[in-house]
Amino acid sequence: MKRNKIVSILLLVAMTFSIVLTGCGDKKTTEAPTSSPGPTTQETSATNEQSGKATRYTSKETPFVTLNGELKKYESPFYLTSVGQSADVSMLDALMKKVGAEYTYNATAKASDLKDVKTVIIATGASSKGLGAAGISAEDEKARASELLEYCKENDITVIMAHLGGVSRRGKLSDEFADMVLEYSSGIVMVEDGNDDGKFTDFASRKNIPITLINTIADCIEPLKIIVGK
């Protein structure tokens, strides 16, 4: 009898010990794991650089930003034309009218049209439809642009490049037209979406010319007022 009592006590102790161990194990499995800290600002910047995307400067709250200097008033008379014959030049024409600018507009202007002009604003961006409507080929457009740009250089006419079509005005032909104009430009105004790869900000930095980035086409109003002195 005494022996059976001892066995019962030992079994009770063993069961109690097992319950304690099980409880401890359950507690460990229900504890929330420690979360890893989020990326630091430096890590985020490094990720953006590795992804190949340029830093974003504009937003709804900051509609335009000028890098590499200040946006300023340029000398008149002004002339507005296109290289690439996209519809962007028509939108820029409407914006120029809206700010009350005094200027001459001809999307297919030739060098001979620029007599006495001091500042040329060139809307860049290729459009096969626009080229077709103008009755000219891409090669014809390049030849016209080259002649016009050389005339500007020889006669001290300031060239401002306007790239307002965003990503839709990027691509092989559009970039070829843009590259032609960039080499003669004293300033750039562009919708920032078209600079996702940093092409234009990198160029402006290398050449040390001001580039004004705008959030949307509508945000071009204030920069244009400054450029034309309105």
What are these regions (language model features)?
Residues 15-19:
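Hydrophobic core
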